């Protein structure tokens, strides 16, 4: 059994932000931190006070996280980025909204005394003395303290206060992972209600000391338990009066949804998985109850999630093609008009969307990547709508004469024709590159539609059915929003965005088979008609070849593609292998090309290099971040592994930004999560000279000073399938609509009482719906008998509520 938490985060837009630049504008971006750990950075939107981001993320976390904070920053090229403001949502706040937090939130000023992080290790004892009881507080160590100095560290000490008496530990220089092992004693009086306050501070020689956080201990509770030892989370000082600046710093529109799940062992989900798979295998030949019922009881707002979960479950069982084929038949059975076929947000449409993103994303990158990159690099002004042509955006064609509107339109048409032609040519050449399971699925779709709508008058309908998914729901959205499909790291500027939009419209016209209705919508697209008309013929030829795949060819192609073992992640990184001697500087990193597969992390000078080194995946013990001070630069991670002789080794890799850092960490953690010998602790610093830079320990192979974060990952399109989690999510959905399922069961069984599943299947054959209700009942009992699924609270009962 495993407890898992996932955060869905959508950063929509900001408004009324203050101007930070001398131009009266700002260059805003967002940093998202979970418990003060940066995990996401949005793109920068230049020169605006009302930025639109529209970025979505799914973050997997341990259920013990406390808060997520959104920092709006202003990017500066020459100086440090300015902090505009922040929005902080605690775990309890998010959990109090079952459907998620959604709306505008005012930005507040960032108070240094509230920017605390880390934990402190304390041992607390009450023991009898000669005249009165004594309170003994041992301050052992701390970890992950906030760096307050410019060198990326702090000089921490601890101040312990009780009943007017104050004691302080020694100062540990340049460490966010200090060790003190100092003990203080105080006299306890009967009935005394005062709390014990333990504060961490950063010592400064010239300026005032910086607050690092505090813990308030309930002494009365400590009297009862007599002794307590553990890690206590540092809290901000909330006794200070806050400035009322809400609204002055602008607002941020967010969507945040928390999902907590208790995932049972695989054996508990087997009856549910077998039942659903049996229904799909029977297809339209069986009773056909469950899949239509699931669609019928699924609301519009959760249909995409349900479709994705079902698709991933059947993909893991090798039944994705059969599942989608069943949905195609169900949709066709209730469709009489060809112009509405697969145009609604049905379970079939949503499932195919998810299917293409899971199974076809690498194919999409291969076809669209070069064209999208060229559009971004050229940055040409492109416009076909005469009412939107602006001369100031055009520039000059010669030394003196600006271009006329007609010249702009003609040049724009030429540019778009070139891009569209290149895209269609790339698509025509990509038949063999398309995954076999995608080709086989489209083959089934093509055949089903042709069977449902035979005749010459419906000749184009099977082609339009395929393009409604391939072009309208996959290629066109990727062209319009390349960042959301991981084709680019940043959003397009206004000029490039307009070019992409026009190109996407042209692709849609080709996908619609150049129908008169699509032509009539925007007459100014007429200059592209020759290319669109030619593209229709190319696209029909491509689809004819795409769906021309037999079972044997499908298996052969699948085997060929699987032997290639596509990388989980790849790209250039900088590597440093420390020998522990001399200063470690960022300049000592060497640029190499890395490729992570399900077998190894390999690296070479170039992607095509024949000679490469590798780290076996089974030898990886942890993948974690490195303190900024260690190399004088940020975005460094470490891969801790063992060599063939079993000796521990560490490779330090530098990324170019926080997003790339977290993407690589996520990928490494996901593929190594089931390794034996994973570390529970590590050193976030480096071993320099004779000690660790983080905690100053002198034992190189000793226990780490910080806990590993193997469960903190970002969800990506190429994540490994998690069958148990998908089954749990499907169970959770079915549990939510159980009343509707019982209602349908009563209708089918002639008014039987709700909650009474037939118990004698030998006398009356138990239908699939009755079996499903029985499975849900068994899973509910399994969850009830397991430990509580709610996230654990703080391990210490001595923390006093701070207001």
Curated annotation (Swiss-Prot):
Amino-acid positions noted as binding Ca(2+) 2 in the UniProt annotation, renumbered to this chain: 21, 74, 76, 82
SMART domains named among the record's database cross-references: BTK (SM00107), C2 (SM00239), PH (SM00233), RasGAP (SM00323)
Cellular component GO terms, alphabetical: cytosol; plasma membrane
Residues the record lists as binding Ca(2+) 5: 149, 202, 204, 210
Residues reported to bind Ca(2+) 4: 149, 155, 202, 204
Principal location class: cytoplasm
TM spans (from-to): none
InterPro entries according to UniProt: C2_dom, C2_domain_sf, PH-like_dom_sf, PH_domain, Ras_GTPase, RASA4_PH, RasGAP_CS, RasGAP_dom
Positions that bind Zn(2+): 683, 694-695, 705
Chain spans, region Disordered: 781-803
The PH domain, residue ranges: 566-673
Entry-linked Pfam families: BTK, C2, PH, RasGAP
Sequence ranges assigned to domain Ras-GAP in this UniProt record: 318-546
Cofactor: Ca(2+)
Residues where Ca(2+) 1 binds: 21, 27, 74, 76
Gene: RASA4B
Keyword Iron among UniProt keywords: no
Protein name: Ras GTPase-activating protein 4B
Zinc finger (Btk-type) in chain: 675-711
Binding site for Ca(2+) 3: 76, 79, 82
Location(s), subcellular: Cytoplasm, Cytosol; Cell membrane
C2 domain ranges (all copies): 1-105, 116-232
GO MF entry, a single one: GTPase activator activity
Residues that hold Ca(2+) 6 according to the record: 204, 207, 210
């Amino acid at each position: 059994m495993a407890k898992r938490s996932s955060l869905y985060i959508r950063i929509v837009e900001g408004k009324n932000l203050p101007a930070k630049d001398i131009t009266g504008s700002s260059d805003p971006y967002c940093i998202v931190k979970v418990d003060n750990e940066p995990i996401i950075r949005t793109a920068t939107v230049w020169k605006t006070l009302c930025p639109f981001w529209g970025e979505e993320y799914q973050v997997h976390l341990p259920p013990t996280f406390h808060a997520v904070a959104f920092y709006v920053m202003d990017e500066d090229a020459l100086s440090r980025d300015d902090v505009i403001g922040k929005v902080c949502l605690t775990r309890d706040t998010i959990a109090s909204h079952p459907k998620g937090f959604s709306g505008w939130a005012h930005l507040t000023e960032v108070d240094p005394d509230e920017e605390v992080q880390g934990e402190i290790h304390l041992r607390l004892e009450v023991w009898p003395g000669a005249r009165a009881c004594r309170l003994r507080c041992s301050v052992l160590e701390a970890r992950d303290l906030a760096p307050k100095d410019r060198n990326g560290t702090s000089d921490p000490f601890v101040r312990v206060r009780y009943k007017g008496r104050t004691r302080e530990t020694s100062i540990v220089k340049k460490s966010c992972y200090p060790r003190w092992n100092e003990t203080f004693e105080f006299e306890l009086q009967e009935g005394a209600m005062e709390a014990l306050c333990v504060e961490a501070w950063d010592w400064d020689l010239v300026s005032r000391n910086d607050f690092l956080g505090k813990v308030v201990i309930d002494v009365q509770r400590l009297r009862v338990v007599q002794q307590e030892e553990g890690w206590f989370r540092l809290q901000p000082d909330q006794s200070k009066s806050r400035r009322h600046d809400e609204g002055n710093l602008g607002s941020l529109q967010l969507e945040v949804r928390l999902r907590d799940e208790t995932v049972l062992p695989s054996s508990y989900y087997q009856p549910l998985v077998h039942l659903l798979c049996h229904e799909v295998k029977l297809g339209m030949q069986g009773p056909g109850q469950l899949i239509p019922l699931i669609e019928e009881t699924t609301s519009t707002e959760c249909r995409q999630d349900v479709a994705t979960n079902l698709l991933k479950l059947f993909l893991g069982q090798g039944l994705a093609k059969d599942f989608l084929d069943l949905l195609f038949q169900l949709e066709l059975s209730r469709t009489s008009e060809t112009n509405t076929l697969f145009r609604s947000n049905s379970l079939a449409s949503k499932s195919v969307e998810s299917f293409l993103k899971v199974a076809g994303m690498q194919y999409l990158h291969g076809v669209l990547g070069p064209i999208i990159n060229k559009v971004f690099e050229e940055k040409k002004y492109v416009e076909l709508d005469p009412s939107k042509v602006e001369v100031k955006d055009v520039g000059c064609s010669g030394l003196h004469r600006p271009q006329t509107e007609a010249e702009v339109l003609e040049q724009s048409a030429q540019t778009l024709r070139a891009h569209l032609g290149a895209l269609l040519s790339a698509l025509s050449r990509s038949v063999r590159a398309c995954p076999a399971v995608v080709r086989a699925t489209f083959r089934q779709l093509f055949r089903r539609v042709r069977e449902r709508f035979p005749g010459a008058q419906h000749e184009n309908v099977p082609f339009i059915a395929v393009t409604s998914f391939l072009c309208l729901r996959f290629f066109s959205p990727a062209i319009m929003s390349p960042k959301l499909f991981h084709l680019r790291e940043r959003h397009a500027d206004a000029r490039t965005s307009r070019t992409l939009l026009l190109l996407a419209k042209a692709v849609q016209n080709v996908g619609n088979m150049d129908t008169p209705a699509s032509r009539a919508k925007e007459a100014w697209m007429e200059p592209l008609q020759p290319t669109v008309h030619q593209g229709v013929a190319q696209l029909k030829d491509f689809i004819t070849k795409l769906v021309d795949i037999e079972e044997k060819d499908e298996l052969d192609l699948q085997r060929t593609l699987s032997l290639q073992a596509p990388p989980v992640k790849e790209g250039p990184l900088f590597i440093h292998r420390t020998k522990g001697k001399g200063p470690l500087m960022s300049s000592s990193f060497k640029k190499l090309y890395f490729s992570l597969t399900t077998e190894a992390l390999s690296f070479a000078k170039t992607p095509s290099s024949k000679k490469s080194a590798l780290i076996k995946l089974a030898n990886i013990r942890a993948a974690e971040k490195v303190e900024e001070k260690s190399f004088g630069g940020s975005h460094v991670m470490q891969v801790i592994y063992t060599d063939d002789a079993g000796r521990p080794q560490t490779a330090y890799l530098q990324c170019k930004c926080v997003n790339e850092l977290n993407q690589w960490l996520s990928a490494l953690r996901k593929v190594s999560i089931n390794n034996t010998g994973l570390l529970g602790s590590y050193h976030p610093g480096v071993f320099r000279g004779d000690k660790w830079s983080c905690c100053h320990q002198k034992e190189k192979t000793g226990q780490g000073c910080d806990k590993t974060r193997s469960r903190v990952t970002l969800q990506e399109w190429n994540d490994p399938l998690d069958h148990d989690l998908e089954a749990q999510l499907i169970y959770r959905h079915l549990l939510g609509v159980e009343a509707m399922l019982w209602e349908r069961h009563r209708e089918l069984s002639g008014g039987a009482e709700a909650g009474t599943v037939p118990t004698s299947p030998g006398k009356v054959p138990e239908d699939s719906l009755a079996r499903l209700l029985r499975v849900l009942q068994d899973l509910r009992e399994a969850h009830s008998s397991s430990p509580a699924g709610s996230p654990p609270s703080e391990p210490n009962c001595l923390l006093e509520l701070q207001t």
